[in-house]
Amino acid sequence: MSVRVRARRVLSALLTALVVPAVVVAGLSISPAAAHAFSRDGLPVEYLDVYSTSMGRNIRVEFQGGGPKAVYLLDGLRAQDDFNGWDINTAAFEWFYQSGISVVMPVGGQSSFYTDWYSPSALNKQTYTYKWETFLTQELPTYLATNKQISVTGNGVVGLSMSGGAALILAAFHPAQFRFAGSLSGFLNPSTIFMTNAIRVAMLDAGSYSVDNMWGPPWDPAWRRNDPTVQAQALVAAGTRLYIYCAPGGSTPIDDNTDAGVALSASSLESLAVAGNKAFQQAYAAAGGRNATFVFPASGNHSWPYWGQQLQALKGDLIATLNG
């Protein structure tokens, strides 16, 4: 099969995944409006409104104190404006309760890739410019240090799907702040021609956001600046502890109660991510990287049950790294 035919088929799979009426998958697919795993009553979860000078507005942050070090949990492409997807779809606050680690969940940022954009999204007439990297690495850490006694250094960041690559990029360019970075089903080679087009389609579907306002045309340097595979050397040089998970698609017992259409969507999306993860692994090894765990199971889909499972799997490593 030629590369062109394969690319056309994979892009078709992405389009199919985007229009399937999924109710439990997230990231580059359709995520639920209704929550089913909010934090139980009694957990010390706070809802903070943190003013972002760079974006000219308050950003909601879900926060659970637990120690001076924190893990930042980033959301997927269809991030909602009321709660973070990790709280909506998993028991992440419960898992980290009394772990000695604080939990920081920024809310919002649909289609943002948690990056600093060039300008407001033109297609949906966005009224301000996303400046998520600035918020996460300057404004929020300052607020948390002042008000919640969270260290500005030696923390962790974990992302899924859209934010998997963002987590690695944040760690690559801000190594003092993040000594641990995890990517779950992330898109780790976004500057390839195929992925630039796939991301364009996905962002149009998720809120009519314009990728041109984010990183410009495909040849703009911002694409490579925000490509974890290109930046693998920086992660190696910093000695950042990494956890990388991605499956090739295909159902497992986790999907037993999942609608067939939803499972197809999730499988298609996961299969899109795996090539970029393998490319990152190769670049990381070529740069001399020896401080990463790579988890590539034989099957698995692009959905919250898998990401919740992997967050629990990496938890011990994360805590040991932050407390080390």
Roles of regions detected by a PLM:
Residues 22-26:
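Residue-level signal for alpha-helical transmembrane segments in multi-pass membrane proteins
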Residues 12, 16, 27-324:
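Non-catalytic cap/lid and distal C-terminal segments of serine-dependent acyl enzymes
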